[in-house]
């Protein structure tokens, strides 16, 4: 469905979460997800305040925050979500058996299922990981929740390729109600008419090509126009040292939207 508009896909999908996501993308004219990896809550919230108008999703690693508290971190985060109309994606990368991930998702100090619209998981444990996370979501909230499976990664030497990727896609197909898409480097082809996977792609940069820790960057046009991804995930390109988050937010939003329009044409 790479040649359908986000609006057309919003109308077609059976998933309330995906419908909400594509509607936000269309209304705000942005397919940009901001990855906000900082260690203080004040900086975290300040960056989201600045980037909010330009993004459809904010991606968190909530356990990075040194001063996390539900009241001082999550409550204001949810207020920003309402103010700027974006979804929250906690990049937790669950990777354990069903019962364990159920608790990791819903309990502890973070209570992820209570506030994160989207989370993600590795396929290593098998289908039980999907069942455990879905059960936790159903037991803790009435709000729509969705899971992305990690089909491919952007880091050098990743083993999430070939047969592993295909088996992860098979796991996703075991529950197409809760699993809404993938972290991947390219569009995941639909097997039948009821499939329309959301693909979010990390490792996107307009300036840098990589880092010393194995990250590899591709351009926005390579990812969206060429590979058919739906949402670009950008972190250091927006909030890295010396960067102006507002200027970069505008820049990446325009680049992402232009690449999407080029794909449609």
Curated annotation (Swiss-Prot):
Pathway: Pyrimidine metabolism; UMP biosynthesis via de novo pathway; UMP from orotate: step 2/2. InterPro entries: Aldolase_TIM (IPR013785), OMPdecase (IPR014732), OMPdecase_AS (IPR018089), OMPdeCOase_dom (IPR001754), RibuloseP-bd_barrel (IPR011060). Its EC number is 4.1.1.23. SMART domains: OMPdecase (SM00934). Substrate binds at residues 37, 59-61, 91-100, 217, 236. It catalyses: orotidine 5'-phosphate + H(+) = UMP + CO2. CDD domains: OMP_decarboxylase_like (cd04725). Coiled coil: none annotated. It comes from the Eukaryota. One of its GO terms (biological process) is 'de novo' UMP biosynthetic process. The keyword Hydrolase does not apply. Keywords: Decarboxylase, Lyase, Pyrimidine biosynthesis. PROSITE patterns: OMPDECASE. GO terms for molecular function: orotate phosphoribosyltransferase activity; orotidine-5'-phosphate decarboxylase activity. It is an enzyme of class 4 (lyase). The active site is at residue 93. Belongs to the OMP decarboxylase family. This is Orotidine 5'-phosphate decarboxylase. It comes from Saccharomycopsis fibuligera. The gene is URA3.
């Amino acid at each position: 469905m790479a040649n359908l508009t986000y609006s057309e896909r919003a109308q077609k999908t059976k998933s309330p979460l995906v419908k909400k996501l594509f509607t936000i993308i269309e209304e705000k004219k942005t397919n940009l997800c901001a990855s906000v990896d900082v260690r203080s809550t004040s900086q975290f919230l300040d960056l989201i305040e600045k980037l909010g108008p330009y993004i459809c999703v904010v991606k968190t690693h909530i356990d990075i925050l040194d001063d996390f508290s539900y009241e001082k971190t999550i409550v204001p985060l949810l207020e920003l979500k309402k103010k700027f109309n974006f979804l929250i994606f906690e990049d937790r990368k669950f990777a354990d058996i069903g019962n364990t991930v159920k608790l990791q998702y819903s309990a502890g100090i973070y209570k992820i299922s209570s506030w994160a619209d989207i989370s993600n998981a590795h396929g290593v444990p098998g289908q039980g990981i999907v069942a455990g996370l879905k059960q936790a979501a159903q037991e803790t909230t009435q709000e729509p929740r969705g899971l992305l499976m990690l089909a491919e990664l952007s880091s050098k030497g990743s083993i999430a390729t070939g047969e592993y990727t295909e088996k992860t896609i098979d796991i996703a197909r075991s529950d197409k109600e809760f699993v809404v898409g993938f972290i991947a480097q390219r569009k995941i082809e639909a097997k039948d008419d009821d499939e329309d996977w959301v693909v979010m792609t990390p490792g996107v940069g307009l300036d840098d090509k990589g880092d010393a820790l194995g990250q590899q960057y591709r351009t926005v046009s390579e990812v969206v126009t060429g590979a058919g991804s739906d949402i670009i995930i950008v972190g250091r390109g927006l909030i890295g040292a010396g960067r102006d988050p507002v200027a970069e937010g505008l820049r990446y939003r325009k680049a992402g939207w232009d690449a999407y329009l080029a794909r449609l044409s």
